[in-house]
Amino acid sequence: GILTTPVRKTEDGLETIVSVNYVAPYMLTRQLLPLMQPGCRIVNTVSCTYAIGRIEPDFFEKGRNGRFFRIPVYSNTKLALLLFTQELAERLQNQGITINASDPGIVSTNMITMQAWFDPLTDILFRPFIKTPAQGAATAIHLALSDEAKDRNGCCYANCKKRNVSERIRHHAQQKQLWDDTEILLRQKGIRF
């Protein structure tokens, strides 16, 4: 995923964070589905920030400018990816293909540096909780390979354990609408599945 500032648009007119963090995984998954057989597993990378995300009517285009507004846009994309994970799990429930979400936690990458005056302070506060890239990848690997996760579907995991997702997210009113809106958007761009 990415967390950029200032707002950038793709050549298709989508906000870049939305395009990379949500639309690209959606498209890749949808394009690979016809090749998948029972036993295949799909793992999407989300973030605990999905809990503060919102899906608004201008989700695909808007974005916001400035250092402090990229976090809400990022959170919105992670909510969208979790909703996609849940919706696809429902659609694939009888096909033997599982799809789950992995929350790697705060991982020591360039993405966590905001180039802001408060970075040294946040580094001191969060450093004890920051994972190495290998530690961050462990949950996704667990979902992809472990026996424990082979029959799980539509779940969110963190630290290699199933996370309890709030009722509001598990039964999100916009889950099916987001799927439909994404399909419409991609058809408008000439992409069909």
Q: Can you name each region flagged by the protein language model?
A:
Residues 77, 101, 124-163, 170-176:
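C-terminal helical subdomain
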Residues 87, 139-142, 181:
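Generic recognition of well-ordered alpha-helical segments
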Residues 9, 166-169:
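Short acidic, glycine/proline-rich loop/turn micro-motifs
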Residues 59-67, 116-125, 160-163:
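Short glycine/proline- and charge-enriched loop/turn segments
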